[in-house]
Amino acid sequence: MNFAIETVNLNVYYGQNHVIKDVDLKIPNKGVFALMGPSGCGKSTMLRTFNRLIELNEDARVEGEVRLFGENIYSEDVDPIEVRKKVGMVFQYPNPFPHLTIYDNVAIGLKLNGLVKSREELDERVEWALKKAALWDEVKDRLNDYPGNLSGGQRQRLVIARALAMKPEVLLMDEPTANIDPVGTAKIEELLLELKEDYTIVLVTHSPAQAARVADYVAFLYLGELIEVGPARKVFENPEHELTEKYVTGALG
């Protein structure tokens, strides 16, 4: 099997606090892979190791390997900026740039990184990304408006479009529906099912129900340890570990 991300003996510390403990994990290429577990189990920390965003925290220390399509992204000769071009990130709170128009929110990464050669190419890429994020039809007549008037779900899809415009190979999502209403959540979950045909999506979720709805594979983390990993249906219908069973049935919060 072709793996998009592999961790080898991954350990993460915040100061003296050991938050990810000896995790070996393989994330297949393409599809939705959910990291699930209760609050404080290390899900978001692990996600941030996959694009080296963890290094923005001065107290963080990473040991072991994280391989992106076979390459250890923590090797000394690897530029974290180049890693983040390949690995997009969507955060829990919809965070479009409020001072930029809808158009410029999508275009900014392309401009800053010189990824397009003409205004025509930029227009095409912005339209493509907004269509990929299932937002084009809702905003095509107001691209010069600011995102403040968009709903929470629309703002999050705008952020997804901003990430997709860079044409990443992997998309990391840290509880992307946690602060969005049920209608917006349903649209984003539907979008994930479409995007997984072309991307590897790693989704952090506190909701076993959401993982069951959208994930092809799931990993259950508890207190920084990888308890169980496998195809979503198997983990939910026939978990091997008692802790996993308690979590997916709601007995462990």
Swiss-Prot record:
SMART domains: AAA. Gene3D superfamilies: P-loop containing nucleotide triphosphate hydrolases (3.40.50.300). Its EC number is 7.3.2.1. Keywords: ATP-binding, Cell membrane, Membrane, Nucleotide-binding, Phosphate transport, Translocase, Transport. Pfam families: ABC_tran. It is a peripheral membrane protein. ATP binds at residues 37-44. Its main location: membrane. GO terms for molecular function: ATP binding; ATP hydrolysis activity; ATPase-coupled phosphate ion transmembrane transporter activity. It is found in: Cell membrane. Residues 5-248 form the ABC transporter domain. One of its GO terms (biological process) is phosphate ion transmembrane transport. SUPFAM superfamilies: P-loop containing nucleoside triphosphate hydrolases. GO terms for cellular component: plasma membrane. It catalyses: phosphate(out) + ATP + H2O = ADP + 2 phosphate(in) + H(+). The keyword Phosphoprotein does not apply. Belongs to the ABC transporter superfamily. Phosphate importer (TC 3.A.1.7) family. Part of the ABC transporter complex PstSACB involved in phosphate import. Responsible for energy coupling to the transport system. The complex is composed of two ATP-binding proteins (PstB), two transmembrane proteins (PstC and PstA) and a solute-binding protein (PstS). This is Phosphate import ATP-binding protein PstB. It comes from Thermococcus kodakarensis (strain ATCC BAA-918 / JCM 12380 / KOD1). The lineage of its organism: Archaea, Methanobacteriati, Methanobacteriota, Thermococci, Thermococcales.
